[in-house]
Amino acid sequence: MGRAGGGGPGWGPPPVLLLLGVTLVLTAGAVPAREAGSAIEAEELVRSGLAWESRANDTREEAGLPAAGEDETSWTERGSELAAVGPGVGPEETLEASAAVTGTAWLEADGTGLGGVTAEAGSGDAQTLPATLQAPDEALGSSTMPPAIPEATEASGPPSPTLRDKPSLVPELPKEIPLEVWLNLGGSTPDPQRPEPTFPLQGTLETQPASDIIDIDYFEGLDSEGRGTDMGRFPGSPGTSENHPDTEGETPSWSLLDLYDDFTPFDESDFYPTTSFYDDLEEEEEEEEDKDAVGGGDLEDESDLLLPSQKPGVGPGTGQPTSRWHAVPPQHTLGMVPGGSISLRPRPGDPGKDLATSENGTECRVGFVRHNGSCRSVCDLFPSYCHNGGQCYLVENIGAFCRCNTQDYIWHKGMRCESIITDFQVMCVAVGSAALVLLLLFMMTVFFAKKLYLLKTENTKLRRTNKFRTPSELHNDNFSLSTIAEGSHPNVRKLCDTPCVSSPHARALAHCDNIVCQDDPSAPHKIQEALKSRLKEEESFNIQNSMSPKLEGGKGDQDDLEVNCLQNNLT
């Protein structure tokens, strides 16, 4: 370096570096490249390269502007050294040397970036590299060594001894650019925070996580074939028998469960204890259950009537129920078929009647209504048709009939037993009726009592007025006669009891009193006739008295008094 500082032109690198380079070239050509773990030799090469670079830079600065030939020679020597070092040294040494020249920071060979790289010198084959790689464009931009190598090769002067003995591999370096790039990429520092993706080998299937995608074989034959046809249908609906025929003429177990799962048997405890006529019905139900257990093939036809098919897109879980089972009060004339409707059974004495004609027609019989295309009884569709525990019956030509419940002190009435009559209501009606009768009797008693009181008051007033009347008022007043005519006899009897003044006409007075005091109803008429005849006699008698002398006047006055007394008695 001291010689270079003296300004001697054309001085090349020191001979120690040349010997080291020749040794490395020979070892690289005879022995395979070292592994990436040889970090000590790489460090030595980096140190020597740094020392050589500093010397060359100092020489160029002190020498000023040398000749073009000398400059080319010095750079040729430098380039030839690099060319000699390049093929003989492993790729890691080459990269480290280039990093020393370009100033790029590289990791050590035993770092995480080069842990998985294995390459042979000069082979150009890249093995599997780690995933923490930069983009190829970035690697090409960061590396400046490959374009400098061909320039040095073209500007080189006389070849070095190393180049004479062995052909230089400098032209082949551009072919190894991918390897260099990959090695540069491998030397970059990985991001510790970013996870490393894994790249599987070719030819091996990678296990993917479970997804929501379902195999298409499950939906095979959605249109018209396969098991997909039953997805939109309820078990037992029309169409299932064609796709899944019964193997031995027996329905599967699920059909029986779906048909009879919601069926509620009749429970006598729900009704009232009038169960004397249920014995025959229980026997009929047992016979029907035996027939259903033996003839299981008919259940499919019954399920077709019971469960009509739904729309294709609606499943059994989302659709509305097609039918419901309800507990129906049993009766002698009712026949309950599991898949059909409740209909009237013919009585033993009546001829059998076909119910299919009425069910298939437009109208249903009395007591039946159309539901889901079939005629069903009102008692079946509406379990609460009869209120207050009443029992619903179907009667021919009448329809639904409710038999109301009867208990102690409780009665029900109405067409559907909607009215309740309790013991309290009966008591209220009885007490109210008795109160009305008593009130009527009281009113009648008061009315007649008042009438009698008015009559008694009138009689009392009449008696008081008769005591204070003078004989002249009694003679001019006809009230006494009217009273006698009305049948009020007490006054007449009182007059009969009063004695009159004794007179010569005692015989006539006695006869007159006899007539008045009798209880004969025709007495008033007799009295009037007697008075008239008597008055005539008195008139004639009075005329005779007026013609008599005054001495006899005393006797005349006495006779007048007797006549007046008689008139008073008559009145």
Swiss-Prot record:
Stretches of the chain found on the membrane's Cytoplasmic side: 450-571
Subunit structure: Interacts with ERBB3 and GOPC. Binds TNR and probably TNC. Interacts with MDK; this interaction is independent of the presence of chondroitin sulfate chains and promotes elongation of oligodendroglial precursor-like cells.
Biological processes per GO annotation: axon regeneration; cell projection morphogenesis; cytoskeleton organization; glial cell projection elongation; modulation of chemical synaptic transmission; positive regulation of substrate adhesion-dependent cell spreading; regulation of synaptic vesicle exocytosis
Name the record gives this protein: Chondroitin sulfate proteoglycan 5
Residues of the EGF-like domain: 376-418
Organism: Rattus norvegicus
Cystine connections: 379-392, 386-402, 404-417
Positions annotated with a glycan in the UniProt record: 38, 57, 76, 123, 132, 143-144, 153, 156, 160, 162, 198, 240, 318, 322, 372
Keywords from the named record: Cell membrane, Developmental protein, Differentiation, Disulfide bond, EGF-like domain, Endoplasmic reticulum, Glycoprotein, Golgi apparatus, Growth regulation, Membrane, Neurogenesis, Phosphoprotein, Proteoglycan, Secreted, Signal, Synapse, Transmembrane, Transmembrane helix
PTM entry text: N-glycosylated.
Membrane-related topology note: Single-pass type I membrane protein
Sequence positions bearing Phosphoserine: 472, 480, 488, 548
Gene Ontology CC terms, in alphabetical order: cell surface; endoplasmic reticulum membrane; extracellular region; GABA-ergic synapse; glutamatergic synapse; Golgi apparatus; Golgi membrane; Golgi-associated vesicle membrane
UniProt signal peptide: 1-30
Extracellular face of the membrane: 31-428
Keyword Phosphoprotein: yes
Keyword Secreted annotated: yes
Pfam families, per database record: Chon_Sulph_att, Neural_ProG_Cyt
Localization terms from the record: Cell membrane; Synaptic cell membrane; Endoplasmic reticulum membrane; Golgi apparatus membrane
Tissues expressing the protein: Expressed in cerebral cortex and cerebellum. Expressed in retina (at protein level).
